[in-house]
Amino acid sequence: MLAAALVALLCVLWFVCSRWRDVLSGRPVESLRSVRAPLLLIAHPDDECMFFAPTVLGLLREQRPLSVLCCSTGNYYNQGEIRKKELIQSCAALGIPSSNVTVIDHRNLPDNPDVQWDKHLLADLILTHIKQKNVDLVITFDEKGVSGHSNHISLYHTIGCSVMVLESVNVFRKYLSVLDLPISWLFHRDILFVSSGSQYTQAKEAMMCHQSQLLWFRHIYLLFSRYMAINSLHFLHDNKREKDS
Ligand SMILES: *[C@@H]1O[C@H](CO)[C@@H](O)[C@H](O)[C@H]1NC(C)=O
Ligand SMILES: [Zn+2]
């Protein structure tokens, strides 16, 4: 009974959200109008859809060009080669062609939460890519890295140009799915991307490309994670400005 009520509530809320998403997420259009070449910077194959799908789909909806730089092959269980392919498929499912996806495969940047990535090496590789592609905005994790994975956090600490970071929310909000929308709406700082129903489905389809990652707990993640439907981001320079003043 309670479950049914919850599901019904979720559906209603969602319907309302997807209808109002243009109002709710009106700011991306404005703040990102001048951006020419945004880059999504991730640590592992699957970050793009597990955490950033609403952003990716939101940007593509605005006809923004987008490319992806993934800093490891996700080789923790020796599945690097498979996971690289899964990333390409998943990006295609989201609407990013393989020509816009780059994977760094460096033995000193292993997919491993216990290894602190060498900041100089990482910075070198990322900045080279940024220059080559004339990237003017980098979108990546914030200092908490959403899941707390140290590779995610390394990315935050590495880049120095115009950067927008994905806000990590507490664990309670993280698994509220779309019920987190009112909270996100009230408290987001710069940009809010809310997926429509069809975009949510698209994100799930992209996640299905990561077959090697679909262990039982990931299915639970997919069901309840707010990051499958909602992304709130803020500009890093705003952050710095606040700290300076
Ligand atoms: C892929 O990258 C190219 C060159 O930066 C860009 O023109 C194009 O719009 C991008 N495609 C997508 C779907 O973002
Ligand atoms: Zn990751």
Could you say what each language-model-derived stretch is?
Residues 1-15, 160-245:
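The feature marks non-catalytic terminal segments
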Residues 1-160, 215-216, 221-223:
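Active-site beta-strand->loop->alpha-helix modules in alpha/beta enzyme cores, enriched
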